[in-house]
Amino acid sequence: MTDEQVALLQDLMFHTVPGDLAAAEASFRADMRTLYGKASKAAKADIAEALAESAIDLRSVLPEWNLKNKSRHGNAVCSQGELDAEFDMTVALLRELGEAEQAKRAEAEAEQIKTSNLARMCRKSLEGEMNTHWGNDYASGLRKAMQKGAILVTTNPVLVDIARKEDPKFWTPVRDALREKHGVSDPVALGYAMTIQVVVANAKLLRPIWEITGHALGYVSLQLNPKEARNAAKMIREAVAVYSQLEEELGGTPNTVFKVPGTAAGIDVASAVTAKGMGVNVTVNYSLPQQIAFAGAIEKNSTAPVSFRTHMDGRLDDPVGEELEAAGVSDWEQVKTWATTAIRQREYTMLCNPPCEGGLGFGKSAPLAASGRGPWNITRTLANGPVTMFITVFPNRQDEFDEKKRQLKPDGMWTPLPKGTLEKLYQSRIFRQAYEPDGMEPKEFISFVPSARTLKQFGDAYDEFLEWMCKG
């Protein structure tokens, strides 16, 4: 689809008064029919894709935000029957135009959304049955994820590098234009310019949700230079500069947050950046000591509407598993999957629960689960507590989670550890460091095994990305 066509679909879903939908859809179909008749082969493909996507939208989660939103429109909302009627007319038009494959795709994807666990999770949260939202843990494919309820997206050097590799026909010309505009003398500045393009494209897709929810949802995470994880001053300068560029690109306050590393320097960055009203997402973060340090800094200093504290589930569980295997724990592969669960239960109890329930009642930053390795990372993160729980999910893990119907328990986070599991986990030094509130001092965060591994991977990917930007 073209950018113009995407904008048309956004208007239909987010900016159309429910009572005007039938007329707006009819006008859209008429325009597409007229354009199709005189279009080139490539343009016809774009039109057919846009028609199919508009049909899928009607049976997706997207209407929940506006067209079916009673808090905005009272009882004057669209019924599912009205949406289905528009779906049928759009699919019929595709077949009339000879685009049977796109018609079949629209029907198939609409059926997939109907049975999607992720879509069901979003709807349950919108209805108040749970308080858990999910996002796309990938730099591309956001619009398809939004159809299943995604309300945020994350980017990091690895993901941006993957995005340009997967779609070189799109991103290579963008890179070439940025080279011509900025030159190649400052690779970091050029890298940020490219990252901003990825972020802005995603931010525009999520911006209506951000507006509708009063800036509570609809954010894009943008990672600061991972090579500067020890340099607070430089990260702060870069955040301020990038934020200014995002304001210009988006025409107002950016619906973005900065990913800051869970290091000692990162604490200073989180304090300074959130004090300026810019949200953060703490990454390279695996432990209760890190969560306590960052939650406290954000709670004390932040004037931003939203910040997140990501826990990188699999990036902790995997090295814990290595230590358990070395210690002779026979069922280490199963035991390691409970490491993050144990930490998350303690974290939420300590930081999110209100004082009357033994917690600190922090509300300026929300916990976010990421880097999951299987369905358990999702089902054991579901919650209905006072602070929203967020999850970002890799595309392949989205498919895995949706491959069969799953029970979505609003209290899934509190699934009890199997008997003896905590004792086995304690045989891992990495787990003990992560689980105990005083397991590490801030100066140790950067050398913590999962942190060191992740920072190296992010740094290597960042170097590869800058190499492509400047010389590729």
PLM region spans:
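Phosphate/adenylate-binding glycine loop and adjacent helical scaffold
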Residues: A145
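N- or domain-start disorder-to-order transition segments that initiate the globular core
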Residues: A85, M89-D137
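C-terminal extensions of enzymes
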Residues: L9-D20, A24, F28-D31, L35-A48, ...
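Short, surface-exposed connector motifs at secondary-structure boundaries
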Residues: E248-T256, S271-V280, P354-G363
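Catalytic alpha/beta core domains of metabolic enzymes, predominantly
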Residues: T263, G279-G412
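Active-site-adjacent beta->alpha loops and helix N-cap segments on the catalytic face
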Residues: N231-M235, V260-T274, S287-I298
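Conserved, mostly hydrophobic/aromatic
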Residues: N156, L222, F258, V273, ...
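Active-site beta->alpha loop and helix N-cap motifs at the rims of alpha/beta catalytic domains
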Residues: A108, G149-A150, L159-A265, Y462
